[in-house]
Amino acid sequence: MYLHLLKSKIHNAIVTSGDLEYEGSITIDSELLDLAGMIPNEKVLVVNNNNGERFETYIIKGDHGSREIQLNGAAARCALPGDEIIIMTFAVMEEAEARNYKPMVLIVDRHNNPKSRHLVGEQSEPLSN
């Protein structure tokens, strides 16, 4: 049996901008992608902590160090600049692997600076800006 598990997440990111005219996606600072273990074109589930909305899209790599979290296309209607969101990726794995798998969690501050990261169930690793 195959299970869908949380692979990684960027927790409490702040939307910096939106572009309704873009063809779709979420643009994320490449440094944040690397720290969270996410890659361009990966499918994401996004939760808006301000209004409860959930939506799926895919990742576009943003400039390293830009702290950009931009919603593009229709996704720009799901959250406004300043809204707090959680960005999650998932993986499909067999039950035996899933039992020991630990997702990566990247915590960011109100300016999308990386604060800490940890594998679920393990101690947090502080990150300097």
Curated annotation (Swiss-Prot):
Family: Belongs to the PanD family.
Disulfide bridge partners, by residue number: none
Protein name: Aspartate 1-decarboxylase
Species the sequence originates in: Chlorobium chlorochromatii (strain CaD3)
Cofactor: pyruvate
Signal sequence coordinates: none
Active-site positions on this chain: 25 (schiff-base intermediate with substrate), 58 (proton donor)
Gene3D superfamilies, sorted: 2.40.40.20
Subcellular locations according to the entry: Cytoplasm
